[in-house]
Regions:
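Pyridoxal 5′-phosphate
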Residues: 1-286
């Protein structure tokens, strides 16, 4: 059922069941997080320059509304991410560090444990979009010290398109104001309107209407298969295949843009073919 599905999502990311809210998409989950936080003038949000737009626009909007600013940390020339450079950007004004665990273009992986430690020192929140790693790489938000995790089911999880989730550390939920409101935000479908009622204090605080049954149940079924196989085993096989792919690409004169597998344990492989990229694209589409 729906509650069992919520528990499965919680197992995937190392959260408590009662701290996982179902969302229509990962982008909606990020927006709820960014726009629900009580930011103030002067607050800073630290992020990477490689972020997918859905993990950038909500934070820019949140900063603009509050009178804060987004601090963008640049990648290295070879597109690697220097965690030391990111940590150096975290300071007394930092309210949130918002980043992807695994970057969508390069597969670059951020050392979340180190970033979390830096966040704790200044009282900042660590918000992680984990969509590019969940299902193929082990993840435990509690062990890593992550405050909030967003994700979706359509990538490595091999689940339905159009379903996401928001997982929070215990105690963080009530700090966030719902950005979408409905009957379930405040009570049940059977309750009459009470203008003085406060939002709920459980996961339904961010689930305003009918339950997202198809996405939640389909996503949970896919996750259960992955958990039964074992994420560690899946990761090892994915890295083996990625190494074989990269070996073949290099043999054909391609230039790899992804970090070496030993530095960034994501199988995501990005490359430029030998010669004219446009010509290669035209040949493939012919």
């Amino acid at each position: 059922g729906y509650d069992a599905a919520r528990a499965t999502f919680a197992r995937l990311v190392g959260a408590k069941t009662e701290d996982v809210s179902m969302m229509p998409t990962c982008a909606v989950a990020i927006s709820q997080l960014a726009l629900g936080l009580p930011l103030e003038a002067g607050d800073e949000i630290v992020t990477w320059d490689q972020e997918y737009p859905s993990n950038a626009y909500p934070w820019y909007v949140a900063a603009r509304k509050a009178g804060g600013r987004v601090v963008v940390v640049p990648s290295e020339a070879d597109l690697r991410l220097d965690t030391d450079r990111l940590i150096a950007a975290i300071g007394a004004r930092t309210r949130v560090v918002a980043l992807s665990w695994v970057q969508y273009q390069t597969g670059a992986v951020t050392d979340l444990a180190r970033v979390s430690e830096a966040c704790r020192k200044v009282g900042a929140l660590l918000a992680v979009d984990a969509i590019q790693g969940l299902g193929v790489m082990p993840f435990d938000m509690t062990a890593l010290g992550v405050d909030a995790v967003t994700g979706g089911t359509q990538k490595w999880l091999a689940g339905p398109m159009g379903h996401g989730f928001l997982a929070l550390r215990p105690g963080l939920r009530d700090l966030l104001e719902p950005i979408v409101h409905g009957a379930m935000t405040y009570g049940t479908f059977d309750d009459l309107t009470d203008p003085g009622r406060s939002p709920r204090h459980d996961p339904l605080r961010f689930e305003p209407g009918s339950p997202l049954l198809f996405g939640a149940l389909g996503g949970a079924a896919a996750i259960e298969v992955l958990l039964d196989v074992g994420i560690d085993a899946i990761h090892a096989e994915a890295l083996r295949l990625a190494a074989k792919l990269r070996e073949g690409l290099l043999a054909h004169g391609a230039r790899l843009l992804s970090a070496p597998l030993g530095d960034a344990p994501s199988p995501i492989t990005t490359f430029l073919p030998r010669g004219d990229v446009g010509a290669a694209a035209r040949r493939l589409s012919a």
